[in-house]
């Protein structure tokens, strides 16, 4: 900072000297005038000067175009009196001239050299721009020696083996780790593969939803192999300057070659590897130029250099085909959402440094967190730890974990929100309707928790405990879900003889499931196993998806009738269930009004304490 201030001071002084020289050469201030300003001066206005000259008070004047200076009889000097018109001025002091009371000296204004008036302004402007440019670079990059460093790669290098990440830190991804073991072996023993003529994959693309551990897997590969790990984001290549992205790609691979064997990891590669357009506008953008350089670099080095390029994306469908061909990213590893067993292993990893109570059952937590990614599970245990700390506890109990699950899924509780008794009663019957309908349908997941405490945008919620992870949904599963979603609306109608907007989200989800059954999964008996509507990939828009209708108006009307039929059938089924179990509906709703929240065991005790309920 001190050197920066010193440099700026020098530039400012140089600029001031240049401005002073320009002023001197342009006649604004002569050398003699500059030093004569030290003597006594008198301020005179134009009209007063005319009168003083004609009265004989002025003995000498010097006329230089529109500027008059001179001396009074008492020796007082004046200068820089502006004269609007020199000819008119001479006419006005003609009496004094004729009486020879005054000495007049006429001077031509100093002429500025043509080269000075032409080139000096340009030099000053250029110098000012250079100064501003250097100043900005010093501010952003910390020194004048880094003026051209924006073409350097911004990859972060991880070489500290004491803090390395290994496969022990990556739980629930056994198949993915198995795929990467040969990559690790190649990094450790490349000669074995080279002698056999084997070619290790040059590029490995990790594909999966956000938070599934793609970046963590890449770090584990570098940690297990004990080699340098270069990490960079796809967006770091593209800058405001043309050609910077391609230069950074070249610099990144130059660094990798100097540190081989190593791993180069490009996170969110879809930012730079997006499908190239069709050349609209007669050219290509900076991102495509960067992608072209990346394609060349990946196909330009041999296996004996020991460089493994890994990348991660959650949008493999928009990547350029040239990037996915053999010889570049020729192996794709899908890192999917973990199943129940994998979730339990992930929870064990994240619970290492957390004091868990004896009542915490990680296997049960894994069951109720279907669809959670590794990042979600880590956040879940962190929220549980924060809740325990807020309560002043020294360990995390199952109560905090279950509260954290609901918080992550639907948001924090909003106990301060004020509801009228009518709204509270409506919410209680709505949630009780969901829970009872779900319980009375055969082969349904058991209820885990029912609450009328607001969370997020919801006035209440009903959670279920999945028996097992499902990778496919049958027609009966989807119908069961629609019946459950409509249970809240049916309960409102049966008991309160009115409906509310609280079921809007349920109806929207039920309608979407019914539409997918008809148009996407071919589950309609009338229309048969057909799909309706196509997804168009517009290459001109960078492979953005657009839905196109490929069926007639008659088919569209039939689709609407089928969707309506499914919804009406589910509504009647939910209505039948609740009418047969109306006493249990009242009992659960009253318990919710009293306690606000029921666990799964409390709910089942209320429902099953009498005779066996009617299953529909």
UniProtKB/Swiss-Prot annotation:
The keyword Protease applies. Residues 30-114 are extracellular. Its EC number is 3.4.24.-. Residues 1-8, 136-616 are cytoplasmic. Zn(2+) binds at residues 430, 434, 506. HAMAP family: FtsH (MF_01458). PANTHER family: ATP-DEPENDENT ZINC METALLOPROTEASE FTSH 1, CHLOROPLASTIC-RELATED, METALLOPROTEASE M41 FTSH. Acts as a processive, ATP-dependent zinc metallopeptidase for both cytoplasmic and membrane proteins. Plays a role in the quality control of integral membrane proteins. This is ATP-dependent zinc metalloprotease FtsH. It comes from Caldicellulosiruptor bescii (strain ATCC BAA-1888 / DSM 6725 / KCTC 15123 / Z-1320) (Anaerocellum thermophilum).
């Amino acid at each position: 900072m001190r050197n920066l201030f010193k440099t700026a001071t020098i530039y400012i002084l140089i600029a001031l000297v240049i401005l002073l020289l320009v002023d001197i050469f342009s006649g604004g201030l002569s050398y003699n005038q500059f030093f004569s300003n030290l003597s006594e001066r008198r301020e005179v206005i134009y009209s007063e000067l005319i009168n003083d000259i004609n009265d004989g008070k002025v003995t000498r004047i010097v006329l230089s175009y529109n500027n008059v200076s001179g001396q009074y009889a008492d020796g007082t000097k004046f200068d820089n009196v502006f004269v609007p018109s020199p000819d008119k001025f001479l006419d006005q002091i003609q009496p004094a001239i004729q009486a020879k009371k005054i000495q007049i000296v006429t001077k031509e204004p100093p002429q500025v050299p043509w080269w000075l008036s032409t080139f000096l302004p340009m030099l000053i402007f250029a110098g000012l721009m250079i100064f501003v440019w250097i100043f900005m670079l010093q501010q952003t990059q910390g020194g004048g020696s880094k003026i051209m460093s924006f073409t350097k790669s911004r990859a972060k290098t991880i070489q500290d083996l004491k803090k390395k990440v290994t496969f022990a830190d990556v739980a629930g991804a056994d198949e993915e780790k198995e795929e990467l073991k040969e990559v690790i072996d190649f990094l450790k023993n490349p000669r074995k593969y080279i002698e056999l003529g084997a070619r290790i994959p040059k590029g490995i693309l990790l594909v999966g939803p956000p938070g599934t551990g793609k970046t963590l897997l890449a770090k584990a590969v570098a940690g297990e192999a004990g080699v340098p790990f270069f990490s960079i984001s796809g967006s770091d290549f593209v800058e405001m300057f043309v050609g910077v992205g391609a230069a950074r790609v070249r610099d990144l691979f130059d660094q990798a070659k100097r540190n081989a064997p190593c791993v180069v990891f490009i996170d969110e590669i879809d930012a730079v590897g997006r499908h190239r357009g069709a050349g609209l506008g007669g050219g290509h953008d900076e991102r495509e130029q960067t992608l072209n350089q990346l394609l060349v670099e990946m196909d330009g080095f041999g296996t004996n250099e020991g460089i493994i390029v890994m990348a991660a994306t959650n949008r493999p469908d928009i990547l350029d085909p040239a990037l996915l061909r053999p010889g570049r990213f020729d192996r794709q590893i899908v890192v999917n959402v973990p199943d129940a067993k994998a979730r339990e292993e992930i929870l064990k990893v994240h619970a290492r440094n957390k004091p868990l109570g004896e009542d915490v059952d990680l296997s049960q937590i894994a069951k109720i967190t279907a669809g959670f990614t590794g990042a979600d599970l880590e956040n879940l245990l962190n929220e549980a730890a924060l809740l325990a700390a807020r309560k002043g506890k020294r360990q995390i109990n199952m109560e905090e974990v279950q509260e954290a699950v609901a918080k992550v899924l639907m948001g924090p509780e909003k106990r301060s929100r004020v509801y009228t008794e009518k709204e509270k009663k409506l919410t209680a019957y709505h949630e009780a309707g969901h829970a009872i309908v779900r319980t009375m349908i055969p082969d349904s997941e058991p209820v885990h928790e029912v609450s009328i405490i607001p969370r997020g945008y919801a006035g209440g919620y009903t959670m279920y405990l999945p028996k097992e992870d499902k990778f496919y949904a049958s027609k009966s599963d989807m119908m069961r879900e629609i019946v459950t979603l409509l249970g809240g609306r049916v309960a409102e109608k049966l008991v309160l003889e009115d409906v509310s907007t609280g079921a809007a989200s349920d109806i929207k989800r039920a309608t979407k499931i019914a539409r997918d059954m008809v148009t996407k999964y071919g589950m309609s008996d009338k229309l048969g196993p057909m799909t309706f509507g196509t997804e168009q990939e517009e290459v001109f828009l960078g492979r953005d998806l657009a839905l196109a209708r490929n069926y007639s108006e008659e088919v569209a009307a039939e689709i609407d009738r089928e969707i309506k039929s499914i919804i009406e059938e589910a509504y009647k089924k939910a209505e039948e269930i609740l009418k047969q179990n109306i006493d249990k509906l009242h009992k659960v709703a009253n318990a919710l009004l009293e306690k606000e929240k029921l666990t799964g065991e409390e709910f089942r005790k209320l429902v099953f304490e009498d005779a066996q309920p009617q299953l529909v």
